């Protein structure tokens, strides 16, 4: 797993993903495609960027591991945006999610943040074989860098 920061994003990468690199808070993470290690290192990677996690936005609920980590380890208020109602119901029924986690059923591409966040983690899967992939990634980085100090998007390194 590795990452590029705003000042280190090359023009080639920026143009590929249609990213405005004028701000230093754009971050792209990439991995070897090992989903376990991606999840394992997302929290550690975010520590490298900032020490303040009071308000966190996470796109994608998954099994709730990443939101749970921020809420319990960093005492963060976590907003999770998830578009799958069945997944939300299943995870909420387990009853283990921290009280600081607020799940909103919405699409991260159309969701309008109501507040600023210390970090926005896009823990969602993109279809990297689809040409829309690059547009989707760039649009999320550009959109959430306005309301967040850091934007982190895991990308597969193929």
Protein language model features and the residues they cover:
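Long alpha-helical, hydrophobic tracts
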Residues: 17, 32-42, 91
């Amino acid at each position: 797993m590795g990452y590029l920061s705003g000042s280190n994003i090359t023009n080639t990468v920026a143009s590929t993903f249609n990213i405005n690199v004028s701000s230093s808070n754009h971050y792209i993470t990439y991995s070897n495609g090992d989903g376990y290690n991606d999840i394992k290192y997302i929290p550690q990677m975010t520590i490298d960027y900032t020490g303040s996690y009071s308000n966190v936005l996470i796109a994608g609920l998954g099994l709730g591991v990443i939101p749970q980590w921020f809420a319990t380890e960093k005492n963060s208020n976590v907003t999770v945006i998830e578009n799958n109602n069945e997944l939300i119901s299943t995870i909420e029924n387990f009853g283990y999610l921290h009280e600081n986690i607020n799940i909103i059923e919405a699409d991260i591409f159309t969701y309008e943040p109501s507040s600023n966040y210390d970090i926005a983690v896009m823990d969602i899967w993109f279809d990297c074989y689809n040409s829309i992939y690059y547009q989707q990634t760039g649009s999320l980085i550009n959109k959430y860098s306005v309301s967040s100090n850091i934007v982190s998007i895991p990308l597969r390194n193929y």
